[in-house]
Amino acid sequence: MEHSNPILMGNNSPQKFITIGEVMLRLTPPNYEKIRMASAFEASYGGSEANIALALANHGVDSTFFSVVPNNSLGKSAVRWLRCNDVHCTPMILSTKEETPSHRLGTYYLETGYGIRASKVIYDRKHSAITEYDFSQVDLDALLDGFDWLHLSGITPALAPNCRGLIIDMLKTAKKKGLTVSFDGNFRSTLWSWEEARDFCTECLPYV
């Protein structure tokens, strides 16, 4: 028999979590092969915030994930993967080609380490759907309605200016609505400079 494992608030009622970020297609050579030697790849999905949502759901926490994916087989498969792991995806946006012209799902290649050989990751996420979507269309107040906890990371704002604006607006809305906010800085030097990350995090601090 399965049991829920709610994270409790001060009044002992379970919290509802929402995370925002990019979910990506993960391609991995089987049997610890190196990418340069691979003739096939195993497909799965992942992403920092998506993994958090999945981990919470696997521990019985009411967990929701918000992102933008292209309205095609890859995007729908990513949503299906989340739902199969008990993550709520009601707010997810499946974008049209008009809304996100490149119509891409971000991809990364994972070369799994073996023994003393470290794992390696190659990202192919430029012009993904989440980086091209106009988030001014989203009613953030309605999106966060009914949630108690918002989790964000420093990866999403580093992806593109529209994502940066989304995270700031999301933080302001969460503050206004009284949500608890957790923020994982998670600096990625391949996405933006240390100075850009510092300035952004400084702007975020009043809302965390």
Predicted feature residues:
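Conserved beta-alpha-beta core of the PfkB/ribokinase-like small-molecule kinase fold
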Residues: 149, 155-208
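Conserved N-terminal subdomain of the carbohydrate kinase-like
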Residues: 62, 66-154
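Glycine-rich phosphate/adenosyl-contacting loop at the front of the ribokinase-like
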Residues: 2-90, 114-116, 133-135
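Short gly/ser/thr-rich secondary-structure transition/capping motifs
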Residues: 2-4, 129-137, 191-196
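Short, contiguous strand/loop micro-motifs
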Residues: 38-40, 65-66, 125-126, 157-158, ...
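Glycine-rich phosphate/diphosphate-binding loops that line cofactor/substrate pockets in enzymes
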Residues: 10-13, 142-148, 173-178
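Non-catalytic pre-domain segments flanking phosphatase-related domains
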Residues: 1-2, 147
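General beta-strand structural signal in soluble alpha/beta enzymes
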Residues: 19-20, 91, 123, 182-183
